[in-house]
């Protein structure tokens, strides 16, 4: 997850130098740079009551700095406009980065109250910058005369990004339309915050609660103990709780023996945000979609999707839809084949029902066991979380890029589950700090993500301070964290994002931000190393005996990685299409009934959503309603095409080698947004993206017409 306001990258003046603000007391902890190494947030000293005044002071200082840039009587130059804005807003960036971490990963009622209060103020603050006519006039003067400025390629790219950012924010609108835009932006900030908080509460309230552990048969002793611990954490002694994950399907569905309990758990997930209570999100998302369509129209775009994709790698909704259309025939055919096979398996077992979504994972596992002799639970003893992290994720990065890691116990964290590592570059010098927060808790939003406390910048003399968050099952006290291979993949995925941030070799902090249909490229590419023979041999050892994972089990893991791909791809394509259709609404369209719209949108896909529901339902699709992926979820599929092409290149050139890693780092990971995305990709791959390696990686063949 990237920062809300990309301009907030640095501050050249101390707090006491801001005109009219020298008497503010008491001094806020965010007013000065952190005294900790590398600017790490001092979480041991930050109190909840520091955040709101920190935001208020930070916005005031930033506004004063921007006002000086706009009112500068000197002719505009790259330094006194663009560089000055890059240097501005350090206090606001510090408080925003720290608060973003705790509001997402460790929230509480006080933090939720602050979030509600601050969100519209931040929106108004950013509008005041981007809709400032005098400031834009200086940016536009530079843009119009850019050919005469003698800018370096990186400077020219930054100027282009700033000009486009102002235009996309409404700088060319009339005063009346700017007023309308401000109003829409404020409403959206309030609604997006409301959605996020309703979803968190609804997900917690929607957990499966049972009175008898016998109903959880199939989860195993460890799973049942974890359910008891989850109940205890909620004050439900004597009960057992299976918390909901953020996705439609729930991990426990593969294991639960009782079909009625499986259905109950699935329906708890599917209905978590549509119960007609205070946590129902349907009216909220319909209003968000309507406001986005109105905003797009104000800015001269037919739809929100057209607005969003104008600065993405795909360029237009048509291109994104055409790409997904190429996936649907093979996906739909494989979905049907898989469903038929599951029905046959159910019938062969003497049962009379046909497969439903709550049955799919369980019976897919049976088919997998029968066909591949593979049991995912049998692999878990070889995937102990700490070993996966230090001997797998870190080891792969060392082999590819030469980086090394040392745990830091002196850096304060926002929750006891968090660990911190210092990262050293191939020359032994400091590169970054890396925080990891892997276990699920009720105070944490669902899913997994990467974000940063500090972005690297030569201009500001700063190195990366980055964190990964996930929602892996927390073991009972005293038990090892044995995780599934899917969870292993999640750890490699999120660390791919982290590497992208750590390796950014940029002068200007704004160039750290990349498009949604490019940013998932390094993360999904990094997943491949989880099954690399050399990497796997280093981390996959039995947690008790130390024995390496047997070659036969490795072979089964590899075959299993291509199993059930109709479902895996189908749930992604369905939800990406759902996102695109919500954001293909025009400003003239009436406000939608969320349930009816969703049903119609899914029917249009041509996919078997009755058996293979979308990965997220509209009502709990956090990525698009509060996570920055609106009209961008297709990017997960688009970047699978990119990363499979890249991995095919690696395979053809020797695989896991430092030479290959250094080339990927130089041409992709270090570049940020210093070049157009298609230019960067062609420089590495040698040609435009090709969908065939993606389909081959999933074991799918294109369906011939």
Which residues make up each language-model segment?
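Bacterial N-terminal signal peptides
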Residues: 5-16, 20
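Short pre-active-site segment immediately N-terminal to the catalytic Zn-binding motif
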Residues: 473-492
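C-terminal, non-catalytic "cap/extension" segments appended to globular domains
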Residues: 24-50, 217-218, 234, 239-241, ...
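Short His/Asp/Glu-rich catalytic/ion-coordination signatures at enzyme active sites or charged loops
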Residues: 35-50, 99-118, 141-183, 243-283, ...
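Active-site-proximal, well-structured secondary-structure segments within enzyme catalytic domains
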Residues: 158, 197, 202-243, 291, ...
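Surface-exposed patches in mature extracellular/periplasmic domains of secreted proteins
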Residues: 68-77, 304, 407-410, 510, ...
């Amino acid at each position: 997850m990237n920062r809300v306001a990309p301009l907030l990258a640095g501050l050249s003046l101390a707090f006491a130098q801001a005109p009219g603000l020298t008497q503010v007391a008491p001094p806020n902890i965010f007013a000065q740079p952190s005294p900790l190494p590398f600017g790490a947030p001092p979480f041991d000293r930050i109190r909840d009551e520091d955040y709101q005044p920190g935001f208020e002071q930070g916005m005031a200082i930033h506004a004063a700095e921007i006002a000086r840039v706009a009112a500068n009587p000197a002719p505009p130059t790259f330094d006194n406009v663009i560089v000055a804005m890059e240097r501005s807003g350090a206090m606001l960036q510090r408080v925003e980065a720290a608060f973003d971490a705790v509001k997402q990963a460790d929230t509480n009622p006080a933090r939720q109250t602050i979030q509600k209060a601050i969100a519209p103020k931040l929106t108004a603050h950013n509008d005041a910058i981007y809709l400032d006519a005098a400031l834009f006039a200086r940016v536009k003067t530079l843009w119009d005369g850019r050919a005469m400025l003698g800018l370096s390629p990186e400077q020219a790219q930054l100027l282009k990004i700033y000009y486009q950012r102002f235009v996309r924010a409404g700088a060319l609108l009339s005063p009346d339309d700017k007023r309308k835009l401000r109003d829409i932006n404020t409403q959206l900030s309030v609604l997006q915050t409301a959605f996020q908080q309703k979803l968190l509460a609804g997900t917690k309230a929607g957990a499966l609660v049972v009175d008898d552990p016998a109903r959880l048969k199939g989860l195993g002793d460890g799973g049942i103990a974890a359910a008891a611990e989850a109940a205890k954490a909620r004050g439900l002694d004597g009960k057992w709780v299976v918390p909901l994950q953020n996705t439609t399907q729930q991990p426990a569905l593969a294991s639960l023996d009782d079909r009625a309990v499986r259905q109950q758990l699935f329906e708890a997930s599917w209905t978590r945000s549509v119960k007609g209570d205070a946590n129902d999100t349907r009216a909220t998302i319909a209003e968000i979609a309507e406001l986005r369509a109105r905003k797009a129209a104000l800015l001269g775009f037919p739809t929100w999707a057209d607005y969003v994709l104008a600065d993405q790698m795909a360029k237009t909704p048509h291109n994104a839809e055409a790409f997904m259309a190429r996936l649907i025939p093979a996906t739909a055919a494989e979905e049907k084949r898989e469903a038929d096979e599951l029905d046959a398996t159910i019938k062969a077992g003497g049962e009379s029902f046909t497969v439903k979504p709550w049955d799919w994972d369980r019976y897919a596992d049976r088919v997998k066991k029968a066909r591949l002799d593979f049991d995912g639970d049998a692999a878990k003893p070889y995937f102990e979380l700490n070993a996966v992290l230090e001997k797998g994720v870190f080891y792969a990065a060392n082999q590819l890029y030469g980086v090394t890691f040392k745990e830091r116990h002196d850096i304060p964290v926002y929750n006891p589950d968090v660990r911190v590592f210092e990262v050293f570059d191939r020359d032994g010098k400091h590169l970054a700090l890396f925080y990891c927060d892997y276990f699920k808790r009720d105070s944490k939003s669902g899913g997994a993500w990467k974000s940063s406390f500090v972005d690297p910048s030569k201009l500001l003399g700063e190195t990366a301070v980055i964190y990964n968050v996930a929602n892996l099952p927390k073991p009972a006290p005293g038990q090892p964290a044995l995780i599934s291979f899917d969870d292993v993949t999640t750890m490699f995925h999120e660390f791919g994002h982290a590497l992208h941030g750590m390796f950014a070799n940029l002068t200007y902090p704004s160039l750290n931000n990349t498009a949604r249909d490019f940013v998932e490229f390094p993360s999904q590419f990094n997943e491949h190393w989880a099954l690399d023979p050399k990497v796997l041999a280093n981390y996959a050892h039995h947690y008790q005996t130390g024995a390496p994972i047997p070659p036969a089990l490795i072979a089964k893991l590899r075959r299993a990685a291509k199993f059930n791909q109709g479902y895996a791809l189908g749930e992604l394509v369905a939800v990406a299409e759902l996102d695109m259709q919500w954001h293909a609404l025009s400003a003239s369209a009436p406000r939608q009934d969320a349930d009816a719209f969703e049903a119609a949108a899914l029917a249009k896909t041509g996919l078997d959503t009755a058996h293979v529901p979308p990965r997220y339902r509209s009502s709990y699709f956090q990525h698009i309603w509060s996570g920055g992926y609106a009209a961008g979820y297709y990017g997960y599929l688009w970047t699978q095409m990119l990363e499979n092409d890249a991995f095919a290149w690696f395979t053809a050139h020797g695989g896991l080698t430092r030479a290959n890693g250094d080339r990927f780092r130089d041409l992709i990971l270090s570049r940020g947004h210093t070049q157009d995305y298609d230019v960067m990709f062609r420089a590495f791959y040698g040609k435009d993206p090709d969908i065939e390696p993606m389909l081959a990686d999933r074991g799918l063949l294109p369906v011939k017409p």
